[in-house]
Amino acid sequence: MAIINKGMSRRSFLGLTGSVAAVAGLGLTGCGGSSSDEGSAASSTDSANRGGGVITAGSAYAPSSFDPASTGSAVGLGANWHVVEGLYGIDYHDYSTFNELATDDPKSVDDTTFEVTIRKGAKFSDGTEVTADDVVASYTACAASATYAPFFQPFESIEAKDASTVTVKTKVPNFSLLKDRLAIIRVTPATQTEEDRAKQPIGSGPWMYDSISDTEITLVPNPEYNGEYAAEDKKIQYSILTDPTARVTAQQEGSTLVMELVTADAVDQLESAGCKIDNVQGFGTRFIMFNVAKEPWNDVKVRQAVMYALDTEKMVSNTFAGLATAASCYLPKSFTNYHEASTVYKTDAKKAKKLIEESGITPGAITLRTTDNEQIKGMAAQVKNDLDALGFDVTIQTDTSPATYAAIDGGEAYDILLAPGDPSCFGADPDLLLNWWYGDNVWMQTRCPWKESAEWQKLHGLMDEALAAEGDEQQKKWNECFDIIADNAVLYPVVHVKTVSASWGDPSTAPTARPSMASRALARRACPSGALRPSRRKTRLSLYAGCRPLGPYPHS
């Protein structure tokens, strides 16, 4: 999929290999591999002496649950990719899939039945063998998750044929996205409890968790790993630096080799210090959600009035310093399946006021809930100004993502939510992206209870038709979906952001960092959501900055 900034040179993004939610991602070579094109930044001396160091990263997001079957923790998702393998992995540069635990592509038995064989000798870091029963148990946990379940609606079942083979049955004949969906299932031991998975999952990947705390996450090599990309350094260390000033300071001083979410005002500062700055336009949204169970938000005219009242140009200029784009579709223009929606919310104060008049309501006091994401807080001030001008009396209530969603899930009668989100860490096809927020899940059932509406039913009918179609007919169905969600605006992107990452292009020049030879071969790759993620050629440091908020543990 054409989702990365094609203007970036190969030299700027050496060995591009990862990209999802969408933006600049920089990876540190921490694992070996057979590909030669990924290590070209290192000299022959580097190659002979690589490894043995510590890879450090500044994470903008605090951890919560690490359960691979349900986590919505941005940093947890990224770290898990190094620790917990799936049958397949996703190369986030182009969303292609590659083998992890699987030895080959799924073997077709018939149009809806496929078999996948597990890598011989694969073991979890606790020394137990990976079996088909572990795959089945992991799938069952994912499919039972309130938020992951929509991803697996095309599946009929996954069963163990024998100890090393699973049989996958699909509802959609010749399901073209089979490997993509299987890649979402990260395999943990069937014996590991949900509680233990949430604290510290066990995996079969090149790395394993050494420790997890509120301030630091440490990964060390998995001695049981027998795959292609064994860990070469002795440690990956994520420093949890949610405060942007602390994160920038750590990067500037060299305490971290790479950081995510560089704020616009820190770009020049870090460049002057010698850091490499990269950004890529991606799916990463800053979205607005209405409590449609509460008046007046059950009236589409009121929701549309709010959307037209928002001065997105000021937000893009003032909050993002130009590093964002106002939404003209559910997908950003850089995505292959983009199609301008029938309704595009360009700022129009007169139209907003007319819609309020037509609705017959009298604007009153409302609460704008926001997460504590710095960009969201910046946007919130503009949203308040715009809605106050429309006649509302807006009070901003800011909290952490876990606290915000806990309150909403607990039944709080909120008015409007402004938050970040990006499901493209799971894939980039429109069906997956649509199902994240508009699927039969916690979002449409309780957070934004639109599920019982005729419009939602029509949307899902079109989504089902699109999944079974191909080519132009499939795109036509998706375009209709984009129009429905834009017209109704129950939950919709305000902007798609460009996420900015910083790294020491030559980590040996960092003021206080003492990287290994492997780390000096710093390899960059674009991550459509701005996260640092693994690649098919070499596992990369994975911050997963672009993916949020997810499920019961949304991070923003």
Residues covered by each model-derived region:
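Gly/Pro-rich hinge or "lid" segments in bacterial periplasmic/extracellular proteins
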Residues: H93, R181-A231, K235
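Alpha-helical secondary-structure segments
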Residues: T131-S138, A163-T167, G205-P206, D233-K235, ...
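Ligand-site clamp/hinge motif
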Residues: E195, E224-Q269
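N-terminal lobe/hinge region of extracytoplasmic solute-binding protein
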Residues: G58-V109, T140, I202
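Extracytoplasmic/peripheral linker and loop segments enriched in polar/acidic and small residues
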Residues: T395-T398, P402-T404, L432-G505
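Long beta-strand-rich cores associated with HINT superfamily self-processing modules
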Residues: S501-R537
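Surface-exposed binding/hinge segments that line
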Residues: P150-A190
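Structural transition elements
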Residues: A321, T325-E358, E374-G378
